[in-house]
Amino acid sequence: MLGLENKLKLYGFNNLTKTLSFNIYDVCYAKSEREQKDYIAYIDEQYNSERLTRILCDVTESIGAHVLNISKQDYDPQGASVTILVSEQTLAVKEIDASCNKGEIDILKTRDTVVGHLDKSHVTVHTYPEYHPDNSIATFRVDIDVATCGEVSPLNALNYLIGSFDSDIITIDYRVRGFTRDVDGKKLFIDHKITSIQDYIDENTLKRYDAMDINVYQSNIFHTKMLIKEIELQNYLFNRDVYEIKPKQRLEIENNLRREMIEIFSGTNIY
């Protein structure tokens, strides 16, 4: 069976574009508007552009690519974005465009904003904290895209990405576009076997989630959604202890959290 480790022999450069879109949702119970704002401020600090940059640099390394340029920004009142331009092979300094900062740390420390450019191979992340004063639940979404061309596969970064965030709901999309050719000139529209994104996720991780697939094999489109199975209430309380809450209210909070997760997972207003 051909997988990521079994490479086809190709003619010329591998022109396939592989794109992984990865969204995680973290849900929290914050009763008052003050608690909600404090949660958003906490999340905003925890996942600022500096930390996200480190995560994306690790992603770049895990897929076997090399950083050419980093662009990052923290937003007011909240949120952050990071974009990294990557290359499949190591490039000599003289081959790198003068506008690229190569991810040098000194540059990141001396500028609030680093502006660069994109290419076909890039890694991006955006964060979206959210709450409503009429609802006791706040959410935090991280949107990551890993797009590569050539032999580099973004699927290699999946387990690292899942482990980098507190994820109650995960949605993953993977698609392959373009074509390359084998040595005999035959077109190849995908260069590895894949039946499900779940095949690339650690078994211990999958045990913690209910997962479902929606795949369009003839179009090389793969989609997986994951919903956390067990709710440990203490992990969802912000600045509160579960023992301060009466048992009846605990059950109500758990039900509200589960309803919120189910609606996000299904993409539908159910309740």
Swiss-Prot record:
<keyword id="KW-0704">Schiff base</keyword>
<keyword id="KW-0210">Decarboxylase</keyword>
<feature type="active site" description="Schiff-base intermediate with substrate; via pyruvic acid">
    <location>
        <position position="121"/>
    </location>
</feature>
<comment type="function">
    <text>Catalyzes the decarboxylation of S-adenosylmethionine to S-adenosylmethioninamine (dcAdoMet), the propylamine donor required for the synthesis of the polyamines spermine and spermidine from the diamine putrescine.</text>
</comment>
<keyword id="KW-0620">Polyamine biosynthesis</keyword>
<feature type="site" description="Cleavage (non-hydrolytic); by autolysis">
    <location>
        <begin position="120"/>
        <end position="121"/>
    </location>
</feature>
<dbReference type="InterPro" id="IPR016067">
    <property type="entry name" value="S-AdoMet_deCO2ase_core"/>
</dbReference>
<comment type="similarity">
    <text>Belongs to the prokaryotic AdoMetDC family. Type 2 subfamily.</text>
</comment>
<keyword id="KW-0745">Spermidine biosynthesis</keyword>
<dbReference type="InterPro" id="IPR003826">
    <property type="entry name" value="AdoMetDC_fam_prok"/>
</dbReference>
<dbReference type="GO" id="GO:0005829">
    <property type="term" value="C:cytosol"/>
</dbReference>
<comment type="subunit">
    <text>Heterooctamer of four alpha and four beta chains arranged as a tetramer of alpha/beta heterodimers.</text>
</comment>
<keyword id="KW-0949">S-adenosyl-L-methionine</keyword>
<dbReference type="GO" id="GO:0008295">
    <property type="term" value="P:spermidine biosynthetic process"/>
</dbReference>
<keyword id="KW-0456">Lyase</keyword>
<dbReference type="InterPro" id="IPR009165">
    <property type="entry name" value="S-AdoMet_deCO2ase_bac"/>
</dbReference>
<feature type="modified residue" description="Pyruvic acid (Ser); by autocatalysis">
    <location>
        <position position="121"/>
    </location>
</feature>
<protein>
    <recommendedName>
        <fullName>S-adenosylmethionine decarboxylase proenzyme</fullName>
        <ecNumber>4.1.1.50</ecNumber>
    </recommendedName>
</protein>
<keyword id="KW-0865">Zymogen</keyword>
<keyword id="KW-0068">Autocatalytic cleavage</keyword>
<feature type="active site" description="Proton acceptor; for processing activity">
    <location>
        <position position="126"/>
    </location>
</feature>
<dbReference type="Pfam" id="PF02675">
    <property type="entry name" value="AdoMet_dc"/>
</dbReference>
<feature type="active site" description="Proton donor; for catalytic activity">
    <location>
        <position position="149"/>
    </location>
</feature>
<comment type="pathway">
    <text>Amine and polyamine biosynthesis; S-adenosylmethioninamine biosynthesis; S-adenosylmethioninamine from S-adenosyl-L-methionine: step 1/1.</text>
</comment>
<keyword id="KW-0670">Pyruvate</keyword>
<dbReference type="GO" id="GO:0004014">
    <property type="term" value="F:adenosylmethionine decarboxylase activity"/>
</dbReference>
